[in-house]
């Protein structure tokens, strides 16, 4: 069959939305924690339109008039990294009946990325739903796993730890900033090797004041009279197709190095989930770097089920064909 690739526009958006809904329904059979709203084709088309309205462009690949892949992209810039291409989960899907979608994705990604590469955009970060055949196809195309998104029900928990947890007030924002900096600097350690970040504490405090003003809740853990841990509860999903929007999402979280292994993190998570349950929320979600030797086992052991992944492809055109 001939693969036809068209722009995502008013003539293709409904077919693309129907494809995302088909893939999402198939994924929810394996991972019921995924948001149910993306089972609906109209909701998926509306999400695609929101991407279009925020400077994303996209392509729809079809065989015999039926969409088999949709992929969208927007170029963004972040300090310490520069320009990169963002490919969001609500703008990416593959026909679930395809046994091996590598060829379809290769054609669509090639057409989408070629003009960006010509402009010097060499870093591509794609977020996708957790389906093994999609993971394998993206690996075949040179993408490597970078992050994971996990969800679990908000069911009240009891904690018997000696760690005390309180909700931070405005007077605690300097403590929040100090603990948030611990997390940021940990990411530059092996084996993550992220660029070192050392923003002024005043800037971090202002950032977290903004989160608090927008409804975020900061939980502080105290051990032996000392504030040693932070967990931030936000209500804005970083990936609405994976983490339910309007439901608690765990943001910046940290434990001081000398307090690790003493139940601080688990007590904070128990408190966050209990807070979510007490406020009549159904779900709580988190994202974490899979290379982080502290985060990955911690969040999995805390009961979060991976529902999607962020994968990265960094093009080094000078090294092509030089390995092996």
Report residues per predicted region.
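Conserved active-site alpha-helix within GNAT-family acetyltransferase domains
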Residues: 129-145, 266, 278-279, 290-308, ...
């Amino acid at each position: 069959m001939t693969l036809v690739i068209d722009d995502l526009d008013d003539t293709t958006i409904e077919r693309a939305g129907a494809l995302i809904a088909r893939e999402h329904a198939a994924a929810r059979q394996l991972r019921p924690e995924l948001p149910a709203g993306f089972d609906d084709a109209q909701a998926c088309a509306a999400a695609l339109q929101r991407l279009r309205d925020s400077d994303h462009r996209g392509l729809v690949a079809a065989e015999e008039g039926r969409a088999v892949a949709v992929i969208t992209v927007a170029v963004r810039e972040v300090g310490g990294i520069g320009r990169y291409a963002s490919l969001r989960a609500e703008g990416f899907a593959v026909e679930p009946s395809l046994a091996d979608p590598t060829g379809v994705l290769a054609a669509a990604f090639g057409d989408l990325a070629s003009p960006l590469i010509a402009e010097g955009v060499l870093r591509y970060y794609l977020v996708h739903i957790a389906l093994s055949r999609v993971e394998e196809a993206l690996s075949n195309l040179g993408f490597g796993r970078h992050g994971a998104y996990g969800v679990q029900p908000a069911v009240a928990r009891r904690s018997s730890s000696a760690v005390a947890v309180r909700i931070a007030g405005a007077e605690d924002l300097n403590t929040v900033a100090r603990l948030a900096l611990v997390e940021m600097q940990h990411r530059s350690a092996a084996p993550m090797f992220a660029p070192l970040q050392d923003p002024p504490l005043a800037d971090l405090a202002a950032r977290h004041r903004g989160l608090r003003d927008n409804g975020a809740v900061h939980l502080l853990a105290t051990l032996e009279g000392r504030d040693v841990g932070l967990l931030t509860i936000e209500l804005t999903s970083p990936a609405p197709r994976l983490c339910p929007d309007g439901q608690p999402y765990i943001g910046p979280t940290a434990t001081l190095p000398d307090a690790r292994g003493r139940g601080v993190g688990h007590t904070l998570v128990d408190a966050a989930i209990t807070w979510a349950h007490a406020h009549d929320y159904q779900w709580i979600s988190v994202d974490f770097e899979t290379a982080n030797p502290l985060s990955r086992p911690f969040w999995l052991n805390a009961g979060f089920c991976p529902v999607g992944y962020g994968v990265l492809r960094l093009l080094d055109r000078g090294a092509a064909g030089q390995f092996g």
